[in-house]
Amino acid sequence: MDTTLRPPRTSKPLVGIFGNGLSGKGAARLCEKLHLPYEIIDERQQSQSPHFEQYGLCVFSPGFSPNHPWRQRAEATNVPSATELDFAASCFNNPVIAVTGTNGKTSVTEILTQLLRNSGQEVLSVGNNGTVLSEVVADGGLSPDGVYICEVSSFQAQFLKSLHPTHTLWTNFAPDHINWHGNLKNYFEAKYRLLKLTEKTCFCGNSLKETFQTFTVPSSAASMVFAPPAEELNDWLEQFPLCFSQGQRENFALIRTFARRLNIDEATLRHTLEEFQQPPHRLHCCRRIGTTSFWNDSKGTNLHAVQAALESLKDLPNLWWILGGGGKGEDLNGFIQTLNRYPVQTICLVGETGRELMQKASEFKANVIHAEILPNVLKHLPTHKAFTLVLSPGFTSWDQFKSFEERGELFEKLVRDYVPSSGS
């Protein structure tokens, strides 16, 4: 690693770390490495507002929204604040490649990491994927020439100041996290902020051309490179088995654009894409019984993901769709309109938003069942007819589960234990 860690300059030595999750714990580790005194402020255990005047720096975890009173209090008292990513970035000079987008961030981050590794570079993926950058830096980090591939969520991007990626890859944009950002424009501007901080090239999914027009921001800068539409690369994409889904086709098209611009040879690119293993709980078939199939897309937590799954599976027989979960301020009418455009036979509503959507059941073209919880879904499946059961819920898991992983694992267990009738 670069052994000359540079602690951020503050007027007072005490660092206030807000949040005791992964980011907060990582920031604390880095403070210890830098010999900076700190205290962790956990909202779940703090009954009173902290005394901000004592801090020289406040490091906020991503969960603190823009209108959180503690953020506002830090601003009112003129205490410098930083994201965990900025705090870590102040301690090294390594190049950073950022990856953001409504969907596809994690897949692109993992592919990009493996691509650069296969090209002979020292590389590590960090950020929103669960590997905390501050903790990595505190534990030694990469050598000065190593590259960090940093997955950046909109929560992290909105407050970035000093992290300047060498390149940024932006997959796509669709409504999400409206309850956190306040409105769609704020959500877009959080993502776009990352592009403005980028030092060299911004690689964008083709669909972002329309997005930039919608928000009237320039899309013709020399530093901005768009991937071609996936449809123009059909012959090239067909060689990769994972490219059955529209979302993955667009991801691969973006990676290809990046690789060609940086002169990574075609053989290395092809090898990387061929060996790539999709992260768990992204759209994949988890069981087949004759022509009946079961699909897990528990990570599909917004309308854009649902539409991508619908587009990928629309030709399969007798579609049964599991929809619902925790809400984030979504327009429920958008889900109704989208599902009505596809040949879905039955919609099984679950969770918090499932109850809300049940009140609009008559607006769906498909048959609607209020299953409430995942185990109940399997009680309603056809007994003498093949079907396609899809968990692509469009909403978070937090109303009934700890994570989308836990939701997906339960679904796959239910599917494994499912005993079909002789006619399925």
What are these regions (language model features)?
Residues 333-388, 423:
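C-terminal helical cap/extension that packs against the catalytic core
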